[in-house]
From Swiss-Prot:
Family per record: Belongs to the CCDC88 family.
Top-level taxon of the source organism: Eukaryota
Name recorded for this polypeptide: Coiled-coil domain-containing protein 88B
Location of the region described as Disordered in the Swiss-Prot/TrEMBL record: 430-458, 494-731, 1331-1481
Amino acid sequence: MEGAKGPRLRGFLSGSLATWALGLAGLVGEAEESAGGTEEEEEEEEEEGALCTEKRFLRLIDGALLLRVLGIIAPSSRGGLRMVRGRDGPAACRMWNLCHLWGRLRDFYQEELQLLILSPPPDLQTMGCDPFSEEAVDELESILRLLLGASVQCEHRELFIRHIRGLSLDVQSELAGAIQEVTQPGAGVVLALAGPESGELVAEELEMQLRSLTGMMSRLARERDLGAQRLAELLLEREPAHLLLPEAPANASAEGVSHHLALQLTNAKAQLRRLRQEVEEKAEQLLDSQAEVQGLEAEIRRLRQETQALSAQAKRAELYREEAEALRERAGRLPRLQEELRRCREKLQAAEVFKGQLEEERVLSEALEASKVLLEEQLEVARERSARLHETQRENLLLRTRLGEAHADLDSLRHQLEQLVEENVELELELQRSLEPPPGSPGEASLPGAAPSLQDEVREAEAGRLRAVERENRELRGQLQMLQAQLGSQHPLLEEQRENSRQPPVPNRDPATPSALHHSPQSPACQIGGEGSESLDLPSPASYSDITRSPKCSQAPDSHPELESPLQMVSQDPQTSDQALQESDPTVETHQCLEKSGHRVPLQSPIVWDPPQGPEVRIEVQELLGETGSREAPQGELVHKAQVLKQESPKCRPRSAELTLREPLKDQKALDRELELSKQQKETGRHEQRPKGLESKLGPQKPQQTSEGVPDAWSREEPTPGETLVSAIPEEQALRDEVAQLRREVAGLEVKLQAQAQRLEARSAEALCLSEELAQARRTEAEAHQEAEAQAREQARLREAVDTASLELEAASREREALAEALAAAGRERRQWERDGPRLRAQVEAAEQQVQALESQVRCHLEEAEREHAEKQALREELEKAVLRGQELGDRLEHLQEELEQAALERQKFLQEQENQHQRYRHLEQRLEAELQAASTSKEEALMELKARALQLEEELIQLRQYPVDLATGARAGPRTVETQNGRLIEVERNNATLVAEKAALQGQLQHLEGQLGSLQGRAQELLLQSQRAQEHSSRLQAEKSMMEMQGQELHRKLGVLEEEVRAARRAQEETRGQQQALLRDHEALVQLQRRQETELEGLLVRHRDLKANMRALELAHRELQGRHEQLQAQRANVEAQEVALLAERERLMQDGHRQRGLEEELRRLQNEHERAQMLLAEVSRERGELQGERGELRSRLARLELERAQLEIQSQQLRESNQQLDLSACRLTTQCELLTQLRSAQEEENRQLLAEVQALSRENRELLERSLESRDHLHREQREYLDQLNALRREKQKLVEKIMDQYRVLEPGPLPRTKKGSWLADKVKRLIRPRREGALHGGPRLGADGAGSTESLGGPLETELPEGREADGTGSSSPAPMRRVQSSLCLGDETLAGGQRRRLSSRFPGGRSSASFSPGDTPRQRFRQRRPGPLGAPSTHSKGSGVEWDGSIKTLSEHEADDTREAFQEQKPEKQFLTPSLSQ
């Protein structure tokens, strides 16, 4: 014990289990001794630590603290809280407390937790007698571990868990491991009584379970063997040691015989006498004992008969009780099953209701989604219009600035025309004086010989560029096809948007306002087609016949036959073309062609005529003639390329139209760039045909063409192949930059499409979730039906199982009766054996065995009584649970009623909200009417006041008119009256001025009020529409209200049915309570009977103990007699009689041994039969456990059904919340739509104003067109006069061309000698080259004007060809920003400037681009190449350069006019600077 007191005891007390158990003293009301003692005790404990540990250990092993803890864990377990202190000493108290603790703990595990403790029971004797031993410590540790497992599984487990959390982390981890060992059935400490059936387990789980069970059985068998061995040792120790006492006198007599034989004989005789006397006494005692034994046997027979009668009665009582229990169980299960069926029906009805609600919510959500989609579409359309509005505002500002510049350009062009006329007159005079050309000049033959070298060089230079551009075009086509394939695989919503974008609202066409077709902000065709119309060329009238034959225009008759009629009319006759142009405006026809074509190239845009101005007209006409003549050779190839590009460009447009719904500005950029690429690709054919134009100009032509071709050759400057390659490099780099930017934008568009696809997938996923929830609700409904059917089947199976169990019990009772009969037969046989007197020992042993059998039977009866008691307790608990379930059902019914009331309240609230909305609408209508009335009354009052003021002013004017007459008469009166009248006159004038100002302010207010009145009327109309919608909504809500009322009535009816069912359930519950009370009364009677039997059994046990004591005394006496008899036989060894007697005695003993062996075999047979009966009882208990498990499964299924119902309720609540969110989003969208409609009305007002301004501008354009036609006729007449003079100059043509080429290479404007013929042409070329540089240094040439439907292009041919070259060539800018801005300007109107001056539409900024491309350190040659990139940019550069040419030529002719133009350019420069960077970026 000293060894156990050392480290083992300290280690146990410092462990987790002891710490936890000692810490529970505060929970049970005990304070630790260390906290409750005085200071002196604390000092003693500090001095004596060993004593403190012993006290703490004794406090644990005493059992009192653990019993209190167990009272908290299992307050309802049998036995109650009973502790014994100091009755029979501390050891006995400890043993009794620990025994009580173990019994209650074992019952708690078996009854409450349904677990069987597999560990052996603790050695309570060791723990009570030797508490400080290692065995006692181990047993206490196992008890504490089981107590810990029970504490975390009881009803007050939260209290114990909170206490465990208050300990350290190490202790918590150790306690968690101990809890896991105790609570898990597979750990080997406990075994689950109600486990799953073998059919429900997998083969592997079955194998694992069998292995664990075999291990447990082997361990239990070993423990059983050890216990039996220990019990045998204890029984051997209990036998007295008096068997050795008779041997002492025998040894002494033997010694006496050896020493004194004589004395030995005398002593033997005396002993014989004494022995005879003792034998006689013993015979008497044997007779008495036989009589007593017979009496005992009679009593035993009587007891057996009584026990048999009692057992028969007990069996009958058991049968009756079992039958009554079975009937009661059936009767009790019927209402419960009916209740469960009713609950299932209610759940089915609730599921149907939830299903209907889910369908309604789904329909409502679909309607809300549809309305949301419509509102989003309207919102996108409104956003697009607002974006167009902003663009129109910007373009209006640009157009106003451009109109002023165009007017200035017209003035300068008129001045130039006058100067050109004077110069032409001078040139005619010089030609008449100096030149006399012979008719047959050899220059015509030599001229083509020099041109081919330059033409070949240009073709070689352009071939490389064309190949590179074609490669880039192929790459772009592949990218566009990939994008188209990706877009085609998107959601059908994009296709609907594409169809909406393809079918925009087209405004009404009015022949009086032809330009309105392109200025409507609602036409996408204007947006896209405007790019082509911005970049149109306006050729001279002589080139109309050639334009119709060009490759670009050759495509027009296929899709646009309207474009042929004006061109053919112009090509027939100049006079007829003039008449046709005057009668029918070509802009109208070409605009119609544009709208029909949609998205075409620039040459298919409308052609607007502009009057030629001077010799520049001849140059442009001849240039166009040369181009169209040289394009006929590769026409087929270019037509094929243009058709491919046309087929590709519409493929891109639907994609851009789709994406404008999301990002209008970015998509417009992408579309502009795609169209610009198509224009550049088509312009390459035009550049390739430029050298052929030179050849056609140099060859023999018709008189009119040759006469126009000479000035074109003079003004045309062809660079060398090296210069052409140098100029092609920046253009190619710009094209590559545009291609890279297009690729980036395409990637951005793909990202946006992917995001949109993800949003569509999210919406489809939501729809799928809703459908899955609906399907799940249907599945749960079907499962509920199936579970109800399964419950019915299980109930039938339970009934069958109960019947089989009753049959098995009857069989067991019959087997017990058979055992009793076998025992009676064994008793009869034993009676036969007990008739022999000498065999008393065998009879006593048989009596002991019979008594033990009776004890075992009594124990069986007691165990059965305990089982019946436990079953009754279980029945009570089930009845209590049934009562609780009935209460829960009542609570649920009340909860359902509350939910129905809440639903009714919600409907009332919803109806009230609808009424409030109606009242709000009515209030708004009243307010609008009041505001309108107030506005009308205020206007009327203001008008009345104005009229009154006007009348007052008229009266005062009349007075003032009469005042001079009064003055004339009053002057005679005196000077004082004159002064007073003068003061009055001044005051009257002041009053007049104030009245005029007030009148103007009132007029402004009146206009403002009229605008407000219009807006209020629009709002009133919107409110009327909203009120109509609200009325429709209210009608729908009233219909829904009627439906909800019908549903409410149906629910009330169902509620009445449920209440009736609840009443029936309560009546059934009362009946079950009555039955339960009857059962309790029967149980009390049985308990009293059992108590009486227990008292009788106690009396029998007392008598049995007395009989045992007598039997032991008889056995002692018998042993003494046997010893003496053996001594006598030893002494009479020499006597033959004694030997014969001894042999006979031995034979008898052998026969007795044989009989005893037979009895032992019979006993073994009876024990085997008893074990079989116990096995049958175990099987019956197991089947009962299975029935309990099935009952638990039914409960779990019911819990699952309730959980599914709760999930359905949660899903319905989520759907309601989502519908509320959709309502809120719909309200927000309606407000946004109202705001957008207001913006739309404002935009429409502005558009009307712009249309009026456009109409005024179109009238001005017509006037300018008429003037230009007149000036063109004048120029035609002058050109016919010049033809005769120009034919004489062909002989010196070759020399002049060489001089011009030298002049191109040198680019140094020096004076040429006038001695040679044609020197005035070189001077002319110098004058044309010089101002181009000077114009660039001054900030670029003035801004030209172009565009489809624009009328500022009528100012001259330099403006007609300018946009074509700029836009088609792409040299001016590498970004589509100018195209986008100019395109937006085609679809919008103008606003008047501050000064009232009107400006023209569709003007462009070519000069800004060229000026931005120059740098201060450039040489004149570089600047010339930048302005004139060669044949590739011939139209644009030439027209741009020619526009500056005439400014410069004017400067060389007259210096004062040059100063004026420079001042005009300096005045226009600030306006251009803020627009040029945006166009050249």
